[in-house]
Amino acid sequence: MTEGDSARQVRQQLREQGLTPLEVNETTEKAKREANRFVLFRRGASTSELALITRQLATLVGAGLTIEEALRAVAEQCEKAHLRSLVATVRSKVVEGYSLADSLGAFPHVFDQLFRSMVAAGEKSGHLEKVLNRLADYTEQRQHMRTKLLQAMIYPIVLTLVAVGVISILLTAVVPKVVAQFEHMGQQLPATTRFLIGTSELMQHYGLWFLLLLFIGGFVWRWWLTDEKRRRHWHQVVLRLPVIGRVSRGLNTARFARTLSILNASAVPLLEGMKIAGEVLSNDFARTRIGEATERVREGTSLRKALDETKIFPPMMLHMIASGEQSGELDSMLERAADNQDREFETQVNIALGVFEPLLVVSMAGVVLFIVMSILQPILELNNMVNL
């Protein structure tokens, strides 16, 4: 039995052996594997896995291997079955005569429009190795930024959960036991103590309902944002917020500049590059404004002026883009602008977290102090009455 990724490949293998194939049938095992591919491919590939595959492919192509040979080698090096099957299927399409970009287009959930457009440009220009290396750098950079953001958010999230947990335990477990002692005093309790008792009873009786309400509210909010107009309006509001708005604007403008930079360096036309770069933005309002800027560039407006009219990009980035247009080095200036914006984004995140963390600690300490003082106040008043 001869094995291959497609019937055409099996026929070619048989002809190379001096045999004339009359009929090629797919085995049952192969059919089962094909039936399971949909499930495998739905898992896709993580950002780090995609960067590794791209880097390996760039290295092998640079070493002089054909696309088919490079894909075979990459598939053999994949440890996970779904990745190995994915790369093998891309290779089978290449063997059938499709271009690499068209072959990758069969899996848009893994290889997005940016990835495929750059590969197509690299194939046309004959610089596929450079394009793949740029793609690997870009993917690794995005993974690096995502990892740094997650690492920065871990401590505040844990601190918030601990604060909420401690306060909830105090209100639902500690306060009720202490309050039971106050019931036998027969005296007027201070206002702070009465407020604490009311809050504790509210948490005991309606705490679970409150959590359920939060869950339902989150679900309704997600459903509300499924409407394109409402989501775009909300994203516009987000960009206007004091701290979150600056962070969101910095993240999206840096992503746009870096994406357009590598597309421009890969010989992708500017208008097509702007369209693709706009699609990678996470903010719908910013994506709409980029679409409007693309139309203005199509009508003859300079890139700098078109982006300035979006009211999203910072002045420094616009100056660098204008300099790149005048000097003919737009891709390098866009890359520098993206680097500057990434550094500013990291600074803004660090400042925001630097302010949030002590505020959270102080707030938690204030709440705990309020609970303790509300409990101690009637006890101290009782001691004073006894001493008198």
UniProtKB/Swiss-Prot annotation:
Disulfide bonds: none
Binding, Ca(2+): E79, N133, D137
Entry's Gene Ontology BP terms: protein secretion by the type II secretion system
UniProt superkingdom: Bacteria
An annotated GO cellular component: type II protein secretion system complex
Topology within the bilayer: Multi-pass membrane protein
Pfam families for the chain: T2SSF
Residues on Periplasmic side: 175-205, 372-388
GO MF term set: metal ion binding
UniProt xrefs under Gene3D superfamilies: Type II secretion system (T2SS), domain F
Keywords, ordered alphabetically: Calcium, Cell inner membrane, Cell membrane, Membrane, Metal-binding, Protein transport, Transmembrane, Transmembrane helix, Transport
TM stretches of this protein: 154-174, 206-226, 351-371
Region (Disordered): 1-28
Compartments where located: Cell inner membrane
Role according to the record: Component of the type II secretion system inner membrane complex required for the energy-dependent secretion of extracellular factors such as proteases and toxins from the periplasm.
Assembly behavior: Type II secretion system is composed of four main components: the outer membrane complex, the inner membrane complex, the cytoplasmic secretion ATPase and the periplasm-spanning pseudopilus. Homodimer. Interacts with ExeE and ExeL components.
Family label: Belongs to the GSP F family.
Record's protein name: Type II secretion system protein F
Organism for this UniProt entry: Aeromonas hydrophila
Taxonomic lineage from the root: Bacteria, Pseudomonadati, Pseudomonadota, Gammaproteobacteria, Aeromonadales
